[in-house]
Amino acid sequence: MVAAKKHVPIVKKRSKGFMRHQSDRFMRVDSAWRKPKGIDNRVRRRFRGTLAMPSIGYGSNKKTRHMMPSGHKAFLVSNVKDVELLLMHNKTYAAEIAHNVSSRKRIEIIARAKQLSVKVTNAKAKVTTEV
């Protein structure tokens, strides 16, 4: 495996998820974020002490956006030909094998990635080795 290219430190401005208004009060209201649209809504009006709303200011650095802790960006791979696309970009991108790839094809993909020194994020998934 090739180490990732040098980059600025990855900084997440907020790791806590944004909660939907009153999702803590009612079971029927899911916690997944929805923008409040009511005319009197205190979250929409940004009252002090209410839930934070997602905004552009929480976005991460453009250089480190979508970057994994290893410093690579994920690239979805479905066959051996896709792995060969990463030959020149193995310091920037890491291969991630798609969920619908069979275990036989996975073994071929992993072998080719090793030859090209491409990092595979989920190399151990769905690959059984006999004991």
Swiss-Prot record:
InterPro entries in the cross-refs? Ribosomal_eL32, Ribosomal_eL32_CS, Ribosomal_eL32_sf
Which SMART domains does UniProt cross-reference here?
Ribosomal_L32e (SM01393)
Identify the main location: cytoplasm
Keywords attached to this entry: Cytoplasm, Ribonucleoprotein, Ribosomal protein
One Pfam family of this chain: Ribosomal_L32e
Cellular component, GO, one term: cytosolic large ribosomal subunit
Superkingdom as given in the UniProt entry: Eukaryota
Q: Name one GO molecular function term.
A: structural constituent of ribosome
Which SUPFAM superfamilies does this one have?
Ribosomal protein L32e
The record's annotation in PROSITE patterns points to: RIBOSOMAL_L32E
Q: Where in the cell is it found?
A: Cytoplasm
Question: Which BP terms in the Gene Ontology apply to this protein?
Answer: translation
What the protein does comes down to: Component of the ribosome, a large ribonucleoprotein complex responsible for the synthesis of proteins in the cell. The small ribosomal subunit (SSU) binds messenger RNAs (mRNAs) and translates the encoded message by selecting cognate aminoacyl-transfer RNA (tRNA) molecules. The large subunit (LSU) contains the ribosomal catalytic site termed the peptidyl transferase center (PTC), which catalyzes the formation of peptide bonds, thereby polymerizing the amino acids delivered by tRNAs into a polypeptide chain.
Q: Which family does it belong to?
A: Belongs to the eukaryotic ribosomal protein eL32 family.
Describe the protein's quaternary organization and the partners it interacts with. Component of the large ribosomal subunit (LSU). Mature N.crassa ribosomes consist of a small (40S) and a large (60S) subunit. The 40S small subunit contains 1 molecule of ribosomal RNA (18S rRNA) and at least 32 different proteins. The large 60S subunit contains 3 rRNA molecules (26S, 5.8S and 5S rRNA) and at least 42 different proteins.
Spell out the protein name for this chain: Large ribosomal subunit protein eL32
The opening ranks of the lineage are: Eukaryota, Fungi, Dikarya, Ascomycota, Pezizomycotina
Which gene is this protein's source?
crp-63
